[in-house]
Amino acid sequence: MNPRYRFILRFYSSKKPTFHNTAPSKTNVNVPRANKSQSKGKHKGKLLVLVGTLALVTSVISVNYQKNEPVEFLE
């Protein structure tokens, strides 16, 4: 095994896992938290629309530029 990878394995194996109690004391642990997953879905949808719009605008600008000033390739 490469010494570099041995160091990485040793580094990660030396860390001890830490468990944090994030639930309040009088909460049922088996009930899923729906509000966090919904907010992530909303942000993901907005980000997807933003990236799609940006890609479309960039493509239109590129096509228009190629029509007006075509690039001459060197041979």
From Swiss-Prot:
Pfam families: YKL023C-A (PF23521). Keywords: Membrane, Transmembrane, Transmembrane helix. Residues 19-38 have a biased composition (Polar residues). The chain crosses the membrane at residues 47-66. It is a single-pass membrane protein. Residues 19-42 are annotated as: Disordered. Its main location: membrane. GO terms for cellular component: membrane. It is found in: Membrane. It comes from the Eukaryota. This is Uncharacterized protein YKL023C-A.
